[in-house]
Amino acid sequence: MGACLQQVGGGALFFCRGEWFFRFTMMENPDKETKQELAMTEIVKMRDVRFDPGLFVNFSSGTVLDNLLCSYQGLPKGVNYMIIGDPGVGKTTIILDLIANIERQNAGTRILFISAEMNEIDLAVYVQRYPMFGNLNIMFVESDFDGHRHHLQEIEEVLQQGWDIVAIDSFYELQGIVKEEEDITMRLAETKLLALIKRHNKAINDTHTNTTFLTIQQVTKSGAFIGSNRLKHMITAMMELRLDNPKNIYSDRYIVFSKHRRGDVGVKLYYNLSSTGDVTFDEQRYRQELQLRNLQSNVSTQLRDFASQFERLFNNEIEQ
């Protein structure tokens, strides 16, 4: 087991082999034997693990995007989806549209948007164009140049209330704010944020809610994801927003997953931001791409079958 990095209520968070673990224990400095004893309690059989059935009931947005979010449709609970994309492709708009639709489709769902990149004036422009964004709960996080505020503590207190979905724009900017305010390294700031996210994934909050995080992340000039391997490994899915022609901001835009533990990768869903009031998705084009993928898969299967049959016939001829 890795070293204890943070005490949480009646237990502690541990980091080991790229994963976070929570263990209930009041021991602050257990000896070697106790650590080994406690580590053994982490070994389980999944058939013995029990979950609330509601954990596997997804949040529906009422759009075709639900098909990409999960193989059994909708946004799952207690997961981490990271969103990256080319500048100006509409990452914030897509996420705000998604959570606004989920809130509209699922009465009583508690959703929070943490904005570390835009202030109230910036978001007012979004609300004018997409009025339904005005109903969202938003927490603005801005750098405190006076050094009196500690946004990490404020975020911890707010998240402790228990939220179904938390969207962050962006992780890198929030990480930088935490670094400056707490006077720590970027790596430690990342560690603290990851520990916080993992804790709420596992429903360690006042309402025992398995929180889903939608985290927008910045990219390099080449479009590559910014972040450590720890951050990359703990995410459930990587949603990419891309342009057909990266050099032309007016070219067609699409959503595609490059990593997905809950659904398919490589399936494109084209979208349009030109309409006022809502994001529009090209469902017909999406269905056509699915048909083409299925056709390619069937052809590949047939070719493998023919190759296997030929190999068996060839081997039989040699034996005879």
Where are these regions (language model features)?
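Conserved P-loop
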Residues: 77-149
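N-terminal pre-Walker A segment at the start of P-loop NTPase domains
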Residues: 41-69
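Phosphate-binding P-loop
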Residues: 70-78
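Phosphate-binding/switch region of NTP-binding enzymes
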Residues: 84, 201-301
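Phosphate-binding/switch loop-helix module in NTP-utilizing enzymes
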Residues: 143-206
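Structural motif
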Residues: 82, 165-169, 214
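Cationic, low-complexity basic patches in intrinsically disordered or flexible, solvent-exposed regions
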Residues: 7, 20-21
